[in-house]
Amino acid sequence: MKTGVIGCLNTNNIGDYIQTLAVIKLIGKEYKILDRESLNSYNDEPRKVIINGWFMENPLNFPPSNNIKPLFISFHINPDIASDFLNSNTVSYLKEHQPIGCRDTFT
């Protein structure tokens, strides 16, 4: 299966770019960058994707499409959207794709 990497295509936060570079260095092979804010609408071939970093501007864009096979490491839920993000659909998705590696105790 091909690999995807989460990218943040419309941000000026250098930390988002650094996290993307770290994953690219880790996987060290061919990959496609997928926009963090539109993972739900990905409709290309299935890909394994490391899900890491800060989630997200629009909680309605989660969970990712069924063509994304996630591995959650260093995952963080933005506290400002947690009440909208952690709906029954998202919680079911996270349970289905356990374990979820989180980067902080809040998440």
Which residue stretches match the model-derived regions?
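Aromatic- and Gly/Pro-rich donor/ligand-binding loops
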Residues: 1-107
